[in-house]
């Protein structure tokens, strides 16, 4: 096989592998991310939500990031039962939206933040965990504006 044919074959192979593995060509429907179907068992402990000091120290960025952690600490058993559509269950080993706020990931991810604020609002309106989860799966959280979220109480 000539050198030119080898180069062309390798170039073709490279292009095909690149195209087939490109994220923009993959289906947007990756299924429902992992969540816990029920609240933690009575007496079981779950990882605590980070506090403001643990999260930022002196490096606070946007008020809605810190405020999300304050709200998450009010509803840990609810967010424990919610999926997270940034798919951190696959890349980071998270098992629910709660995992995002037990670490710093939740502050850095718009998806996690929007889902948290959506969950908090729906919980405050008296929606059940199943109703809130159905809204998250449907994508209702996507409409939330993070710039105004810090005023949600």
Regions inferred by a protein language model and the residue ranges of each:
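Short secondary-structure junctions and interdomain/linker hinges
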Residues: 75-82, 143
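Short, thiol/selenol-centered motifs that function as redox-active sites or metal-ligating centers
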Residues: 82-119
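Secretory/periplasmic and organellar redox-cofactor proteins
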Residues: 1-73, 120, 124, 129-153
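Short, intrinsically disordered, charge-biased short linear motifs at domain edges
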Residues: 66-77, 87-88, 96-100
């Amino acid at each position: 096989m000539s050198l030119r044919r080898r180069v062309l074959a390798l170039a073709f192979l490279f292009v095909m592998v690149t195209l087939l593995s490109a994220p923009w060509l993959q289906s947007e429907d990756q299924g429902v991310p992992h969540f816990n179907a029920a609240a933690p068992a009575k007496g079981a402990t779950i990882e605590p939500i980070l506090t403001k000091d643990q999260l930022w120290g002196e490096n606070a960025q946007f008020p809605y990031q810190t405020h999300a952690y304050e709200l998450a600490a009010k509803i840990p058993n609810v967010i424990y039962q919610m999926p997270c559509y940034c798919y951190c269950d696959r890349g980071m080993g998270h098992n629910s939206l709660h995992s995002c706020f037990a670490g710093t990931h939740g502050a850095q991810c718009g998806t996690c933040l929007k889902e948290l604020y959506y969950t908090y609002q729906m919980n405050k309106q008296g929606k059940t965990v199943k109703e809130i989860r159905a809204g998250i799966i449907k994508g209702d959280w996507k409409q939330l504006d993070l710039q105004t979220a810090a005023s949600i109480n």
